[in-house]
């Protein structure tokens, strides 16, 4: 099975991406990556509102599948309970199904791929390469400050687990960012700035995808 990794590189921000078909529809996929507390969720909501993208969170899709009580959901729940990593193919299948069901052709995929294996599997299985990767760059100190300061009732927002999550991000997700950076497909955002300023930077990147930017 051929990989799209060697497909001709295209300039990020252009609609012309190689082999990006979902059924009979050409699609635009943007991977959204950043450490815990980097502000990805807030900005994804802004992008959805202003640019007509569908926001897909791999974690949310897995949780929804577990909640559905399906056979697949039970299998996912058992794997998580046993501390095993859910196979990439399972997550990718959920992402594909959500993309098809949405009827849209522009997608933000948030928090995935988490590692190189995820990335390679996504490209091999879907034959879709991202138009670009939106990377929310933020120091560990700032992310820690934000996570400890917000009150979302998340049990995993204590200092030790925050540091563990950050370490996992650096070890697993940064190689994905480096891979796409070598292909000139990373749009880096200074996520330490105030939310409105961050969105100004985001808007400049997404301008070609505005509904009236034909």
UniProtKB/Swiss-Prot annotation:
Q: Where is the major localization of this protein? A: cytoplasm
In short, the EC number is 2.7.4.14
GO MF annotation, one: dCMP kinase activity
Region annotation (LID) maps to 149-157
User: Which reaction is recorded as catalysed by this protein?
Assistant: UMP + ATP = UDP + ADP; CMP + ATP = CDP + ADP; dCMP + ATP = dCDP + ADP
| Entry's Gene Ontology BP terms | 'de novo' pyrimidine nucleobase biosynthetic process; CDP biosynthetic process; UDP biosynthetic process
Q: How is the cofactor bound?
A: Binds 1 Mg(2+) ion per monomer.
Task: Give the EC class as a word.
Answer: transferase
What quaternary structure, including any partners, is listed in this protein's UniProt entry? Answer: Monomer.
Q: What is this protein called?
A: UMP-CMP kinase 4
């Amino acid at each position: 099975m051929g990989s799209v990794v060697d497909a001709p590189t295209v300039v990020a921000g252009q609609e012309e991406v190689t082999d990006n078909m979902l059924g009979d529809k050409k699609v635009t996929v943007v991977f959204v990556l950043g450490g815990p507390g980097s502000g990805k969720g807030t900005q994804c909501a802004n992008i959805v509102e202003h640019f007509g993208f569908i926001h897909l969170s791999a974690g949310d899709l897995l949780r929804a599948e577990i909640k559905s009580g399906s056979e697949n959901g039970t299998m996912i729940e058992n794997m998580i309970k046993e501390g095993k990593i859910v196979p990439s193919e399972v997550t990718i299948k959920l992402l594909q199904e959500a993309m098809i069901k949405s009827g849209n052709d522009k997608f933000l995929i948030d928090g995935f791929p988490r590692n190189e294996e995820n990335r390679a599997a996504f490209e091999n299985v879907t034959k879709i390469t991202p138009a670009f990767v939106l990377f929310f760059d933020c120091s560990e100190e700032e992310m820690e400050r934000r996570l400890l300061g917000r009150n979302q009732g998340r049990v995993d927002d204590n200092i030790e687990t925050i540091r563990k999550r950050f370490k996992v991000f650096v070890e697993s997700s940064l190689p994905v960012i480096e891979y796409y950076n070598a292909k000139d497909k990373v749009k880096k955002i200074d996520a330490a700035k105030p939310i409105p300023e961050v969105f100004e930077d985001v808007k400049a990147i997404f301008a070609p995808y505005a509904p009236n930017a034909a």
